[in-house]
Amino acid sequence: MAPLHESLSSINDVIESKPLFVPITKPILQPNSFNLSEGSLCAKDSTPILFDVPQNVTFTPFSSHSISTDAPLPILLRVQANAHKGGFLGFTKESPSDRLTNSLGRFEDREFLSLFRFKMWWSTAWIGKSGSDLQAETQWVMLKIPEIDSYVAIIPTIEGAFRASLTPGEKGNVLICAESGSTKVKESSFKSIAYIHICDNPYNLMKEAFSALRVHMNTFKLLEEKKLPKIVDKFGWCTWDACYLTVDPATIWTGVKEFEDGGVCPKFVIIDDGWQSINFDGDELDKDAENLVLGGEQMTARLTSFKECKKFRNYKGGSFITSDASHFNPLKPKMLIYKATERIQAIILRRKLVKESGEQDLTELDEKIKILSEELNAMFDEVEKEESLGSDDVSGSGMAAFTKDLRLRFKSLDDIYVWHALCGAWNGVRPETMMDLKAKVAPFELSPSLGATMADLAVDKVVEAGIGLVHPSKAHEFYDSMHSYLASVGVTGAKIDVFQTLESLAEEHGGRVELAKAYYDGLTESMIKNFNGTDVIASMQQCNEFFFLATKQISIGRVGDDFWWQDPYGDPQGVYWLQGVHMIHCSYNSIWMGQMIQPDWDMFQSDHVCAEYHAASRAICGGPVYLSDHLGKASHNFDLIKKLAFFDGTIPRCVHYALPTRDSLFKNPLFDKESILKIFNFNKFGGVIGTFNCQGAGWSPEEHRFKGYKECYTTVSGTVHVSDIEWDQNPEAAGSQVTYTGDYLVYKQQSEEILFMNSKSEAMKITLEPSAFDLLSFVPVTELVSSGVRFAPLGLINMFNCVGTVQDMKVTGDNSIRVDVKGEGRFMAYSSSAPVKCYLNDKEAEFKWEEETGKLSFFVPWVEESGGISHLSFTF
C-alpha cells in the first residue's frame, strides 16, 4: 500500500503512457484544510472547529494514509482533488478495552445537523448548537461554519475490529465511542476512527466525504458504482400491512387482482413475513407455527427450513387460474387482524392488572381470552378448508406452482420478492434443523450505547430468546442455499430485515465487525449468483456498520422507520403526526444513505387519512412506489393511485433522490412551530420541490421516544424559490447549466396556478395547514428564435410528478416544438401564443388555450402499442 498521492501519481503515469487516453495532470499536493495545534482543531488556518481537544487525540491528513482500493479511476481522481479537505481523528488510551470512549474536543454556539439511532435498526435527524446536544449513537454530525461560508462533517468510522459512533459529553464535549462487540477483542489506539471533511456546499460535503471513505476503507461502494434493481421504476404491493402474518396464496392473488380491476396492476409484489417455515423452541421440528396474525407473535420463532410453510406448500398448481380465487373472502385478513387485536388487548390488560394491582380473580377476563382464542382458531380452520379447494387438474404444487400461476394470470407482474431476516427468521434458525451450518443459539447482548434508544418490542423479543446463529464460516452456504431455492421456485428478490442483530451476537466470533464481514460477504455473493446482483431491499439497517460493510452490492434500502398508520402507544393524534415523522426520517437519512444506496421511502396505504400526503412524497422521492393496502374494494383509492402510477405499472420517477433544501438542513420541521419541510428533486426537463407541514411531534430525549406535541400541530408558513433546487447536484437536468439565467415556469399542484420565476425573483410565500403539502414544479422556458414564442411543458397534470411524464422535448424548426409524454390524462404547457396547429400522434388535435394565463391543454389517451407514450407537436 502507498499514500494516496503516490498511488494516484503512478496511475497517472500509466495513463500518460497510453495515447488512447487524454493525459491527466499529476496531483499537486495542497496544504490540508485542518490543523490540530495547542488543543484546537482549526479549519482554513484559524477558524476553530473543536476546542479543548485532549492531548491523546491525533489528526492526520487524508493524503498521508495508505490505500489499497478497487475504486474506479473517476472516483479516485475526485478523491485526490479533494484530499486536502479532510483527514482522520484518532486517540490512544493507556489500557486496551473492547469499548473505549474519548472526547474529540468541544463545540458550542454552532448549528449542527446530525443523524442518530433512535432504535437499534432506525436513524433520524437531530439538531442543536453544542456537543452536549448530540444524542447517543450519532452516525455523523454536520457543523455550519458561517464565518468561512463552509460546512464540516465529522463521521465516525470503522477501524480494524472496532466500529464508532458519537455521543454527547458535558460542557459541549463531543465523545467518540469505539466498540468491538466482544470482550475478547480489545484495542487501545486508533489512527482513523473518525473522518472530518470541509466544503462550502453541504451536499458536496457528504459526497466528497463518503467518496473519501469509500477509497480509504474499500469495504463498500457508492451508489454511482452500482446498478439499481428493476423495481425502482415501478409500482408494487407489499403484503405486510395488508394482512400481516396471515398472508397466503389466496390473499396475494386477490390483492393483485383488485389492483388490476382498479386499472393499475403492480409490477412487483413483496410477500412479507408469514410465508416461511418457522416454529418455536420446544415445537416438533417439522411442524410449522400456526395461526399467527400480528407482528410480534413470530419474533421468538426460528427458521426450520428454507422452503415455504404449509399455507404455501399446499397450493395446487392451476387452482386459481380458472376460479381467480373467487372463493376467497377479501375481508378475511382484516377480520383475523381485528380478532387477534381484540385478543392481544385482553392479554395486555390482564398483565397490567396483575402487575399494577396484583389482582388475583381474573376469571372473567381469562374466560374472555379463552373465547377469543377459540374464535380465532375457528376462523383459521375455515380458512384452511377454503385453501383445500382447488383444481383437479393439478400442475405442480407449492411456491413454484403459485408464482408460475401468478405470472401466467397477471402478465404485467415482473418481480416477486419475499421477506426474510438477516439471520433467517426473527430469532434466526433452529439449530437442530441446520446442523450442517453449525448453527447455535447465541445470547443477544445489547451494547450500552443503545441504552438511550426507544423501547422496542422487537429488541425485547430477540433478547428474550437469543438468536439461532449460523456459524460465520457457513454464511456463504447459508445464503446461497436459501436464495438458490427461492430463485428455483420463481422468486426474483428479497426484502431483508433485522440487519443490526449481528452487532449483539459477536462475543464468540471476533467482534461485530468481523462477524458482519463474514455475513455480508456471503450475502453479496448470493445476490450476484441468485438475484441478478441487485434485487435485494435492505431494511432495519440504518447503522453506519451496514453502510460501511454491506453495500458493495446492495443498491437500495429503506431510509425511514415503518409506515405507522396509527400510534402503537395509543395517541389518537398519532394517525396524523406519525406521518410527518416519517417524512423527516426519509428526507434527512437520504443525505448520507443516498451516497451508497437508492433511498426507499417505504409503503403506505392509499385509504389512509394522510394518504395524499404520503403519495406526494413518494411521487418525487426518486425511488419505487408501493402500497400495503388491505384487501377489499373500499381499501383502495384508485383516483390517488393513478396520480402515482401509469396503467402499465411503471411510474414517472424523478432522476435523482429527494433531499432537504439547504434552508431546511438546520431547522426542526417537527416541533419548532415555524418550519416547513422542503425537499427537492429533478426530472429530465426540470426540478420539483415538495413542501410538507410535519409539525406536531418529535423525539423526546428525556423519554427516549417519539411523542406528539399538540401545541405544535399548527399552520406554518415559509418561502419557496427556484434556487432552493440545488441544480448542480444533477447537471443533466434541463436548466441546470450554470449559464442558464432564464425564466422558469412554476406550477403549483394543489391550485394549478402557474407563474414565472428566475434567480433574481423574490421568493414566493407558502402557507400549509397541519398535515398538508404542496408540490411545485419548475420548468425552464424555451423561446423560439423566429417567432419569439415562449414555451414550457408541464406534462400530464393529473399526475403528482407531472413533469416526470415528459419523456422528451425538442425544437424541431423555427416555429415548431415536439414533446413526448407518457400516460393518459390532461396535458398542460405554457405557451405565450396559441399554436397554429397541434398534433397528437400525427393527427391534428383540438386544444384549449387561455390568453390570460397562457395555459395550453388537451386530453392525451393511453397508447398501448407505444408503451403509453404519445407524440405531441406544436406549430406556431
UniProtKB/Swiss-Prot annotation:
Modified residues (Phosphoserine): S7, S9
Transmembrane regions: none
Family: Belongs to the glycosyl hydrolases 36 family.
This protein's name: Probable galactinol--sucrose galactosyltransferase 4
Biological source species: Arabidopsis thaliana (Mouse-ear cress)
Xref: InterPro entries: Glycoside_hydrolase_SF (IPR017853), Glycosyl_hydrolases_36 (IPR008811)
UniProt GO BP: response to oxidative stress
Reactions catalysed, as given in the entry: alpha-D-galactosyl-(1->3)-1D-myo-inositol + sucrose = raffinose + myo-inositol
Role according to the record: Transglycosidase operating by a ping-pong reaction mechanism. Involved in the synthesis of raffinose, a major soluble carbohydrate in seeds, roots and tubers.
Enzyme class: transferase
Pfam families: Raffinose_syn
The EC number(s) this enzyme carries: 2.4.1.82
MF terms in GO: galactinol-raffinose galactosyltransferase activity; galactinol-sucrose galactosyltransferase activity
Keywords carried by this UniProt record: Carbohydrate metabolism, Glycosyltransferase, Phosphoprotein, Transferase
Description of what induces expression: By oxidative stress.
